[in-house]
Amino acid sequence: MTDPRKAHDAEPTTHFGYKNVPESQKAQKVAEVFHSVAAKYDLMNDLMSGGIHRLWKRFTIELSGARHGNRILDIAGGTGDLTRQFSRIVGPTGEVVLADINASMLKVGRDKLLDKGVAGNVRFVQADAEKLPFPDNYFDVVTIAFGLRNVTHKEDAIASMLRVLKPGGRLLVLEFSKPTNQLFSKAYDAYSFSLLPMMGKLITNDSESYRYLAESIRMHPDQETLKGMMEAAGFERVSYHNMTGGIVALHRGIKP
């Protein structure tokens, strides 16, 4: 017979891909995935998407409305694709913060950007999206690209992003989502669960991390659900754009 006190005290669980794990373990498990893939992350992005991820990110930059002198926060900024472009846009009077919870990804991003001569207006900060270590009403734009699905408490992260934005500031969430066509969805599933882990094994000698990435995409809220989460957090004029048949969606919300 189950002890009701133990049941009451049991730690809440959350999904890690298709598995349920204690909430306290998810961040560490996600960290292990990205420690494993960090060195080959850019190469795998190009192979997995056929380079289309660059177009998705370009559209994110355009929709952000970033301009000279702005302060930008690039959460889960990883290897710095968005940060590099934002650094050019905001210029010497602006500021871009590349934040990532994973030290390995942050190091790869810092090294890559320094090699490309991106410095001066960029800071690198190891930070948890759920508890952002920045002042209230500080940033003009906050972005999170392909990172929200790995966050344990997504509502807390969205609320934290709202807090650090200035009134009128924009949040942009670029994330894998739900394909809008049923036949396309089946083909995408076959690719994600067969070819993707195989590529991970060949390129990084790690099929399990890429199996997790595929599973995490399926467990992420769909377009309308994420829109509702942003509205519930307090964002206004929330909208989203499906790209590549809904494989990816870009959500945008404004802080009132």
Swiss-Prot record:
Keyword S-adenosyl-L-methionine: yes
Pathway: Quinol/quinone metabolism; menaquinone biosynthesis; menaquinol from 1,4-dihydroxy-2-naphthoate: step 2/2; Cofactor biosynthesis; ubiquinone biosynthesis
Entry's Gene Ontology BP terms: aerobic respiration; menaquinone biosynthetic process; methylation
Entries under PANTHER family matching the protein: 2-METHOXY-6-POLYPRENYL-1,4-BENZOQUINOL METHYLASE, MITOCHONDRIAL, METHYLTRANSFERASE
Listed NCBIfam families: MenG_MenH_UbiE, PRK00216.1-1, PRK00216.1-5
Function: Methyltransferase required for the conversion of demethylmenaquinol (DMKH2) to menaquinol (MKH2) and the conversion of 2-polyprenyl-6-methoxy-1,4-benzoquinol (DDMQH2) to 2-polyprenyl-3-methyl-6-methoxy-1,4-benzoquinol (DMQH2).
Name the UniProt record assigns to this protein: Ubiquinone/menaquinone biosynthesis C-methyltransferase UbiE
